[in-house]
Amino acid sequence: MTDSSPDASPSSLKIYFRLLGYVRPYIGLFLISIVGFLIFASTQPMLGYILKYFVDGLSNPQAVLFPGVPYLRDMQLLQAVPLLIVLIAAWQGLGSYLGNYFLAKVSLGLVHDLRVQLFNNLLTLPNRYFDKHNSGHLISRITFNVTMVTGAATDAIKVVIREGMTVIFLFGSLLWMNWRLTLVMIAILPLIAVMVRTASKKFRKQSKKIQVAMGDVTHVASETIQGYRVVRSFGGETYEQQRFLAASQGNTDKQLRMTRTGAIYTPLLQLVIYSAMAVLMFLVLYLRGDASAGEMVAYITMAGLLPKPIRQLSEVSSTIQKGVAGAESIFEQLDVEPEVDRGTVERASINGHLEVRNLSFTYPGTERQVLDDISFSIEPGKMVALVGRSGSGKSTLANLIPRFYHHDKGQILLDGTEVEDFRLLNLRRHIAQVTQHVTLFSDTVANNIAYGDLAGAPREDIEKAAADAYAMDFIAQLPEGLDTQVGENGVLLSGGQRQRLAIARALLKNAPLLILDEATSALDTESERHIQAALDKVMKGRTTLVIAHRLSTIEKADLILVMDQGRIVERGSHAQLLAQNGYYSRLHAMGLEEPAPSGIA
């Protein structure tokens, strides 16, 4: 993508015209606003002509303004000039209202549409996109960038139409009055065009940097707010203050650079315009000819009205460049292919037989193979525990089953059907996940249990799921029970309580295949007991793949797969693996999990 202006760069024009396509649903309102701005622009030359009649009327106020118009042939300048001024003001007010109000409706609708489309698009993007982009920049696109884009698509159009038509009407009137003098004004237009093009390149480049800097500010603020407990626990206040100060200062510096560019550019443009005006006034005085005083005053007045709209037209380049830079990042996200879903198979229900054959996987953009020739099978209702050091590939394997990522080689079969052949939504309806990083939403306890496809579940089913997850004991003590707000990400609940709500959510889903990533965080004895009982309940009768950290869970597994560096190095029951006195036995002696060696992610 080049940094040239929309006037010069085909790529920028393409972006801008694509952006204008979002105005199409509001074309009726948009046309009304254009009519309003045309009305407004038409009043500018009228003011010049009124001054002509006013000056001429000073010497003969009884002169008739419209001698050839019926009903008006007797109206003298004395009555006509004041009346016309009032009528022109009313006409201008009507145009201003139509233009500004209806364009505001278009602008607000455009903001809404773009934000909704961006948010909806976020929900369809593949996991790898979130791996490469931090949340601050994604949020900044929805908030800051959309505002910049709307300015380019609507506010800039307002200036271009209103001020552009004003310039055209004024130039037309000036040419009609004295075309020779008007050519002097037209002679400076090429110089103005060169200045606008040069400034546009700078504005576009600086706008991109500002949007990145604004994303950095949002990112730091978002991270600090989400992790405020860690910040306070580890005395990170000073570090975060410095980090935010640096991000905010970087944004301020870039904003100032853009302001400085405009502050230099606008006075230079004014100097060029007023220099042309000075030459024009000299020629008016020198070449007056047989023109009346009123005609000369009208001509100079209309010429004097030109610098303001010309300056605003030149300054709109800044708004357009900000919008084009913002639109570029927005369209970059909108153009990302959504999650791959080429499957056609839909099953109303499955038994839960899971088989993995010769599975290998490498994360996109990396070379290290995370999974290497993995094979195992789980019969319906059985449990397989994945055990291994951190970074051995356990979580990656679990993420491939619901197709958060797509495997390179091998097969993952669910009831004999490759998971890639399922329709994505249908596949995930058969899978429930409980991860160690519990996500709760700023809503009620009940709505967090009955989330997504589960919304609308009968109240008794929600209560049963909560009871089976051993969560009703603490829910009953909450101020409003199941209708209590849990705060952002369940901040008002303890770690054990949040985990039990996640288990209740999985129980309510009642999926035949459960993927469980046990929490490694230390909990009090009572919470540990409740969670273990809840896990026993949720795993009962379901095919379960568990990333196990608790010895009690591992001992209950029908099959234990011991993983190291992406491979299954041992398999068997707890007793069998201990008897082998191998890798599992060593992990067991060290507490079942040891740190990953250097270089293992």
Swiss-Prot record:
Q: What gene is behind this protein? A: msbA
Keywords, in A-Z order:
ATP-binding, Cell inner membrane, Cell membrane, Lipid transport, Membrane, Nucleotide-binding, Translocase, Transmembrane, Transmembrane helix, Transport
Per its record, how is this protein called by name? ATP-dependent lipid A-core flippase
Q: What is its main location?
A: membrane
Its subunit composition reads: Homodimer.
User: Gene3D superfamilies given for it?
Assistant: ABC transporter type 1, transmembrane domain, P-loop containing nucleotide triphosphate hydrolases
Q: What positions does the domain ABC transmembrane type-1 occupy? A: 31-322
Binding of ATP, residues: G388, R389, S390, G391, S392, G393, K394, S395
Q: Domain remarks in the entry?
A: In MsbA the ATP-binding domain (NBD) and the transmembrane domain (TMD) are fused.
Q: Which domain of life is it from?
A: Bacteria
Instruction: Output the lineage of the source organism.
Output: Bacteria, Pseudomonadati, Pseudomonadota, Gammaproteobacteria, Pseudomonadales
Residues in domain ABC transporter?
Answer: 354-590
Give the similarity note.
Answer: Belongs to the ABC transporter superfamily. Lipid exporter (TC 3.A.1.106) family.
List the InterPro entries. AAA+_ATPase (IPR003593), ABC1_TM_dom (IPR011527), ABC1_TM_sf (IPR036640), ABC_transporter-like_ATP-bd (IPR003439), ABC_transporter-like_CS (IPR017871), ABC_transpr_lipidA (IPR011917), P-loop_NTPase (IPR027417), Type_1_exporter (IPR039421)
Its job: Involved in lipopolysaccharide (LPS) biosynthesis. Translocates lipid A-core from the inner to the outer leaflet of the inner membrane. Transmembrane domains (TMD) form a pore in the inner membrane and the ATP-binding domain (NBD) is responsible for energy generation.
Q: Which GO terms describe its molecular function?
A: ABC-type oligopeptide transporter activity; ATP binding; ATP hydrolysis activity; ATPase-coupled lipid transmembrane transporter activity
NCBIfam families recorded for this chain? MsbA_lipidA (TIGR02203)
Q: Read off the Pfam families from this record.
A: ABC_membrane (PF00664), ABC_tran (PF00005)
Q: Which reaction does it catalyse?
A: ATP + H2O + lipid A-core oligosaccharideSide 1 = ADP + phosphate + lipid A-core oligosaccharideSide 2
Q: Quick check: keyword Cell membrane in the entry?
A: yes
Which Enzyme Commission number(s) are listed? Answer: 7.5.2.6
Gene Ontology CC, one term? plasma membrane
